[in-house]
Amino acid sequence: MKQVDIKLLDPRLQDVFPGYATPGSAGLDLRACIDERMEIHPGETLLIPSGIAIHLADPGFAAMVLPRSGLGHKHGIVLGNLVGLIDSDYQGQILVSCWNRGQAGFTLDPMERIAQLVIVPVVQAGFNVVENFQPSQRGEQGFGSTGKC
């Protein structure tokens, strides 16, 4: 298991330390470390503090902030940047950009679970500038070229 340094910036997280819900969970929940209930109006995007900072330190890893499926499907609450990417050398608080793409306001309570954090491997590639690529079966065929969407 990869060990990650974490700072708990909000003392309330001592009671609900970020962790994995099940042995098969890929992501751990991020919570809304806000002091009082707030409304996210339709079309509005707000930055919500998570109360944690992490330092991955290893350039072979990054963290991704992803939406919670239930919030998006049931309430229209998704990430304003769709996916948040946390680089291995970032050490600041993780902020969650919450966008209400729904038709109704959404009430966010303090310490509510709002997103998930997934640690992923990263490959930093070197690039060779070429004039042409070796032919492949797909070539330059793009959107929808491999079958019905």
UniProtKB/Swiss-Prot annotation:
Its EC number is 3.6.1.23. GO terms for molecular function: dUTP diphosphatase activity; magnesium ion binding. Pathway: Pyrimidine metabolism; dUMP biosynthesis; dUMP from dCTP (dUTP route): step 2/2. Its cofactor is Mg(2+). Gene3D superfamilies: 2.70.40.10. GO terms for biological process: dUMP biosynthetic process; dUTP catabolic process. The keyword Hydrolase applies. Substrate binds at residues 68-70, 81, 85-87. Keywords: Hydrolase, Magnesium, Metal-binding, Nucleotide metabolism. CDD domains: trimeric_dUTPase. It catalyses: dUTP + H2O = dUMP + diphosphate + H(+). Belongs to the dUTPase family. HAMAP family: dUTPase_bact. This is Deoxyuridine 5'-triphosphate nucleotidohydrolase.
